Amino acid sequence: MLRTHYSNEITEELNGKRVKVAGWVQEVKDLGGIKFIWIRDREGIVQVTAPKKKVSQEIFKLIPKLNSEDVIVVEGIVNFTPKAKLGFEVIPEKLEVISRAKTPLPLDPTGKVKAELDTRLDNRFMDLRNPKVMAIFKIRSSVFRAVREFFYSEGFIEIHTPKIIATATEGGTELFPLKYFERDAFLAQSPQLYKQMMMATGLDKVFEIAPIFRAEEHNTTRHLNEAWSIDAEMAFIENEGEVMDLLERLISYVINYVREHNEKELKTLEFELNEPKRPFPRITYDKALEILSDLGKEIPWGEDIDTEGEKLLGKYMAENEGADLYFIYRYPSEAKPFYIMKYDEKPEVCRAFDLEYRGVEISSGGQREHRHDVLLEQIKEKGLNPKSFEFYLKAFEYGMPPHGGFGLGAERLIMRMLDIGNIREVILFPRDRRRLVP
């Protein structure tokens, strides 16, 4: 390897020892008889100090010729001293320029000079050199790691379902069509049907982390056309409350994992991530509409709570319940997909829920309808063709246990967890209504 240590691995035990550090030139300072280079790697900064009397003439003459964002390797001796900004410095014995950076740069990777989001996304490779941007994606990595750890600890099995499908998961037209040889196909908008089919296999508890594709023409700060979904399904449940319990445990685990493992990144972002208040409050859809009505926002029964309503409710729950996270459940059946189980005693209401995080929906779930005859009727009620779902319905004819699950938007979770205003900032190369490159 061209380096022996990252910046954060240089400790006092290495004082007087030889190391090789590598990264991007963040800054060069020439004070005449002494020159400085600050090298940035993914873990932080290394100060290279070059006194004229202690380094070769070749190195001394090369340093002023370095440009910002040149990639260099420095081999030298570690010196811990209070005079150094970071508490230590490296006195260079060798300096090699690996790659030169063009000038001017497309944006300032230190973030001191602000750039428009579009400029940043067009130059994402350089945008991530900004420590604050990199911190977001280190936290994103931790989120996915924590999700897997949680599900494995709960006895779940990871599955992988197809992303090229023949029919819509939930009906509707929000699908990206493609040619599959001589046939028409679509990109999957959800693994819903497949994870339910897994409940007939005996696997009982499954999860998947995978991309989903939705051809929605939204151009908002919280919508993407390609996003990552965290999906779970479990069998032999008694009601949707058990699914909400599972989701609450997952969210709490993830947030606490980030609090524990990403202190440095949270500090870089200057953000305090609080432990979630548990249990998450649970309010019915009817209660949510009542609260909104008291706040002057009227929503007809049966309609989804719109963006304005979600924000008002989020503010209300924070101020009155001290809760950032809360469930809304017992939705009107007409507002939810065909596979959600209705209450037998009140079929206009179903066993669905949404999880809201400070006024933004991050997850939807519920108990599914496992009775073949009832499910078939619900497909027809939604105006869908049962023949399009024969492969799915077949799994319900040979012994299907009661089951439920949820889909959780990874980007929305991260966006709300870190209080970031635009969802495009938490995915490397966003795909939205207007962006297909890079």
Curated annotation (Swiss-Prot):
Entry EC no(s): 6.1.1.12
Positions of ATP binding: 214-216, 222-224, 361, 409-412
Catalytic activity: tRNA(Asp) + L-aspartate + ATP = L-aspartyl-tRNA(Asp) + AMP + diphosphate
Cellular compartment(s): Cytoplasm
UniProt keywords, alphabetically: Aminoacyl-tRNA synthetase, ATP-binding, Cytoplasm, Ligase, Magnesium, Metal-binding, Nucleotide-binding, Protein biosynthesis
Chain sites annotated for binding L-aspartate: 170, 214, 364, 368
Biological-process GO terms, alphabetical: aspartyl-tRNA aminoacylation
PROSITE patterns hit by this protein: AA_TRNA_LIGASE_II
Chain's role: Catalyzes the attachment of L-aspartate to tRNA(Asp) in a two-step reaction: L-aspartate is first activated by ATP to form Asp-AMP and then transferred to the acceptor end of tRNA(Asp).
Cellular component terms (Gene Ontology): aminoacyl-tRNA synthetase multienzyme complex; cytosol
Family annotation (HAMAP family): Asp_tRNA_synth_type2
Metal-binding recorded as keyword: yes
Family according to the record: Belongs to the class-II aminoacyl-tRNA synthetase family. Type 2 subfamily.
Organism: Pyrococcus horikoshii (strain ATCC 700860 / DSM 12428 / JCM 9974 / NBRC 100139 / OT-3)
Enzyme class: ligase
CDD domains: AsxRS_core, ND_PkAspRS_like_N
Assembly and interaction partners: Homodimer.
Stretch list, region Aspartate: 192-195
Marked site positions, Important for tRNA discrimination: 85
Cofactor requirement: Mg(2+)
Free-text comment on the cofactor: Binds 3 Mg(2+) cations per subunit. The strongest magnesium site (Mg1) is bound to the beta- and gamma-phosphates of ATP and four water molecules complete its coordination sphere.
Main location: cytoplasm
Lineage top rank: taxon: Archaea
Name the record gives this protein: Aspartate--tRNA(Asp) ligase
